[in-house]
Structures are given as C-alpha cells and as structure tokens.
Amino acid sequence: MTKNNETGWNLDNSYTTLPQSFYTEIPPTPVSSPELVKLNHSLAISLGLTPEELKKEAEIAIFAGNALPEGAHPLAQAYAGHQFGHFNMLGDGRALLIGEQITPSGERFDIQLKGSGPTPYSRRGDGRAALGPMLREYIISEAMYALDIPTTRSLAVVTTGEPTYRETKLPGAILTRVASSHIRVGTFQYAAARGSIEDLKSLADYTIKRHYPEIESHENQYTALLQEVIKRQASLIAKWQLVGFIHGVMNTDNITISGETIDYGPCAFMDNYDQGTVFSSIDTQGRYAYGNQPYMAAWDLARLAESLIPILHEDEEEALKIAQDEISKFSVQYEKQWFLGMKKKLGLFSNEEQAHSLIEQLLKMMEKYKADYTNTFRSLTLDAIENTALFESPEFKEWYKLWQSRLDRQEQSKENAYEMMKNNNPSIIPRNHRVEEALEAAVTNDDYSVMEKLLEALSNPYAYSTDQEEYCIPPAPTNRPYRTFCGT
C-alpha cells in the first residue's frame, strides 16, 4: 500500500491475491487531451482525497488513464453472466480497476476507470465510452445515493478529446467509478464454469474477508455468504421498488455481492405507476420490467447458489438442498422489506391486515388511473390532494377516508405519521426528461449549468423545498414513451 500525501491516494491491490485467472493486468490506453468536466467534491473528501489537488493537470491525467497514482495496479476483471437469460463468459471490456483506496477511517473502495480502452475481454468493442452515458451514470448514481439506496458512486468525469463511434460520432469520456467492490454474481459463475473448486473457494474466502468478515468463523461460511447476499439483495430490490427505480439490465454480471446498485446504462425512474413499465430499448420482452424485478433478482441469486454448490456441502444432493432452501427465503425477505417500506410511505405504524389492504387498494387505483408514482405519495405526504383523475375518483375518496381513519386510530400522532412519510417519500427523483435536458445541454452545448442545478436539487430528495418544485412536474405527453439505451 502506497500513500501519496498531497492528493491523498492510498492504494492497495488485494484483488491481485486471487488466482490470476480472475483478472488480466493491463494499462489504460492514453487519450489525446483530457479535460475534467465533473468532480464529486464530497465523495473525494470521504475517500481521503483533496479536491483542489484532483483538479490539477497531473491528477486529471490519472482520471483519463494517461498516468497512474502511486501504488496503482491496473487490471481488468474476468467474470461471466446470464445476459437476458443467455450465459456468456465476459469481463471488463472497457473498464480497469486501478486499485483500492483505503480511506482515513479504514474503509476500502475500488477505484475503476470506465471507458479506459480495450481489454482482452472487449469482444470487438473499442473499450471507450461516450460523454452522455457517463454523465448519466454520474447523475443517477448520485441521486440513488441521496435516496439512501446502496450504490456505486461517481468520483469524476473527464472528456478525452477523442470521438467515440456508436450509431453516430459522439464525444468520448471516462468515468471514475467508486464501489465497495466489483465482485458480481457473474464472478462466481465464472469461477464455477472454469471448474476449479480451489479457485471458487479462493473467491468465496476473499469475498467473505472483504464484505462479510463477521461470518468467517461460521460453521458453514459459504452457506452464510449466500444468506448474507440474499439478505442484502432483498433489501436493495425493495428499495428500488419503493422509489420506482427500474434498472433495465438485471443480468447476473450486474448483481453485486456487496448489495450495491451497479451499471446505470438503460435505467430510469417510473412516472405513471404501471407494473409493466419498461424503458430499455433492448428489453423487448419486458424481462426486466418494474414488476418483474423481484422475480429476476431471485432468479439471479439462484445462479449464485448454483455456482456455490461445489463448496456448500461435500454431498451434492445436500448442497443442492441447502441452495434451494436459502433461495426460497428471498421472496419472504423481500416482501417483508417492501411492506415495511410501503407502510412508512403511508404513515402506518402497525402491522395489521388493514395496512396490507390500504396499500394494495391504493396501488390498484394508481395503476387504473395512470397516476404519477412519486407525486401521488408526495401529495399524500403534504396532504395536498390535487385535481388528478385518481384523486377525483369516488374510490379514492373512499380510500382516503379509511386511510385518515386509520391514522387517527394509531397510538402515534398524525404529526409523527406525516413526518415518517416525509422521510420515506422523495419529493424529487431524477425525472427522465430532466436528465435528458441536462445531458443535451452538456453534450451538445458544453453547458454544465443545467446538470449542476439538477444535481443540487437531487442531493436532498426529502427536503420538500420550494426550489425543487420545477423538478416535480411529470413529463409532457410529447416526452413519452421514454426509451433508454445501454451506451456500450
């Protein structure tokens, strides 16, 4: 581990303790004229880095892959994945892990350059990234962080001064992504597919030591690992559902073992409440639709359990039984977390059957009347019932009476109920049309002020500030249907 005292780089490279089949050491491909267009000051400080130093030319060169900080050990990680149900051997095709930053408090975070050039896993890709998708990941990941949803984060975006070719010629960029780690379900699938039990054990042991040290002394630590990942993913997916977030590409290589949201390619936030909502242009069958996300998470975790079977128990039948038993617990854990969250969104403290009924009735009405998901809960939180089709309907008025009666009968005061609602119903989300406006201004006009203003508003989604109201307006019909693209 090497410390650079001026900037604060304090890099370690524990991933290289794994068998070399898990990665390929390769330097980033330099770019012609890098320019820093966005730096995350608060994240930099939390990592032990000095923002003013990071703005200097020598540090911008690091974000661009033209130079490396002391102690860096760039590598591309190997992994596999079920992509829309089809298994492939994959790997970092346009990203490099340059090291693991050890923070002043002793935490460890991967520092990854995304768009840093081709690797042995690029599969005919150019290894580069376009500015628009990198800024989009910055905006959405930081919005997720502010919403208190576990996520990878974005430290910096630099333009490369070079074009990137997709359907059209686009400005190139590199994103510096920060994550608890980049170990995925697909990493375990990769180890299992190669057939080496020793490699699989090495990966599991490393993962436990890094993310779940509390289970190292467990009688069967590999079963405990599966249990912990299931628990974290159940909590994560519930949090997605509660704010209307649609990931769009829940392939097994995009499911982290740490329980963080990763890969913001074709993601978006739901406007009108609809279980079938899909934004991704490549998800033509609706595999990863909003209502399918809990089921797809369970499916992905079943692939993790399959990969762990060789080390869950020496008897294969017993190992299979363990895997099945643990996976069956996901739905119960997810439902528990989701129900708890929905109760908070409606100011309900009790666990009784009427709470279930109130939640189900409201969601059915919201879907029937195509009500805006975020704004419906925002209006209920403010007790400001507006002139919408939902709120004007006779069935909602009846529901509202029942809900108010339930709030009146609780031991806790109504003030406490509304305060809980305020803390669990964001007044603002990264509305898709607002994100596109910010990206258009930045990419086309080199105007980052729209993005900065949006990021400022998104940084405190539970504030209910009058400054945020312009961002609460749903998209006009001309902005629909909204489509997202992975940007690869």
Swiss-Prot record:
The keyword Nucleotidyltransferase applies. GO terms for molecular function: AMPylase activity; ATP binding; magnesium ion binding. Mg(2+) binds at residues 254, 263. ATP binds at residues 91, 93-94, 114, 126-127, 177, 184, 263. The active site is at 253 (proton acceptor). It comes from the Bacteria. Its EC number is 2.7.7.-, 2.7.7.108. Pfam families: SelO. It catalyses: L-seryl-[protein] + ATP = 3-O-(5'-adenylyl)-L-seryl-[protein] + diphosphate; L-threonyl-[protein] + ATP = 3-O-(5'-adenylyl)-L-threonyl-[protein] + diphosphate; L-tyrosyl-[protein] + ATP = O-(5'-adenylyl)-L-tyrosyl-[protein] + diphosphate; L-histidyl-[protein] + UTP = N(tele)-(5'-uridylyl)-L-histidyl-[protein] + diphosphate. Nucleotidyltransferase involved in the post-translational modification of proteins. It can catalyze the addition of adenosine monophosphate (AMP) or uridine monophosphate (UMP) to a protein, resulting in modifications known as AMPylation and UMPylation. Belongs to the SELO family. HAMAP family: YdiU_SelO (MF_00692). This is Protein nucleotidyltransferase YdiU. The lineage of its organism: Bacteria, Bacillati, Bacillota, Bacilli, Bacillales. The gene is ydiU.
